[in-house]
């Protein structure tokens, strides 16, 4: 289970101001006035995850790490800066080929992020070991069972 980033009151005010502008999730994520917050998210998630990808648990190297939005920011702008929606991921797990813009939420949607139901094992809200068994075979892993 990954510990989420936390924001100061000042950071929350900056984020809320951007939400109120009505921009799309991808545009909010690129907002220049929030660059310091994105840098903080990157540092904190990397530290909290002990430099491991939130999904494949591969080792993360500086420069190859990306911030992953578990619920895609392009589908659900309201969760673009939601702390529980942000984790560090390796380039492979964060690639369009692997993740794309797939829906990860099960309807009906709840505006309170943690009260939603997810189609995936959520690295922040769930305990992955309760849902997935990893087998190390020739330096690769397989998901044996997903509940």
Predicted regions and their residues:
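Class I S-adenosyl-L-methionine
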Residues: 1-28, 62, 103-108, 121-124
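Short, charged surface segments at domain edges that flank catalytic/cofactor-binding sites
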Residues: 9-52, 76-80
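Short secondary-structure boundary micro-motifs
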Residues: 37, 42, 53-56, 63, ...
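A generic structural signal for short, solvent-exposed coil/turn residues
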Residues: 45, 59, 124-126
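Short, well-ordered loop/turn elements at secondary-structure boundaries
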Residues: 48-50, 83-84, 126-128
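Histidine-centered nuclease catalytic patch
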Residues: 55-88, 96-112
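Short Cys/His-rich metal-coordination motifs, predominantly Zn2+-binding knuckles/fingers
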Residues: 56, 93, 128
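Domain-exit/linker segments immediately C-terminal to small folded modules
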Residues: 96-147
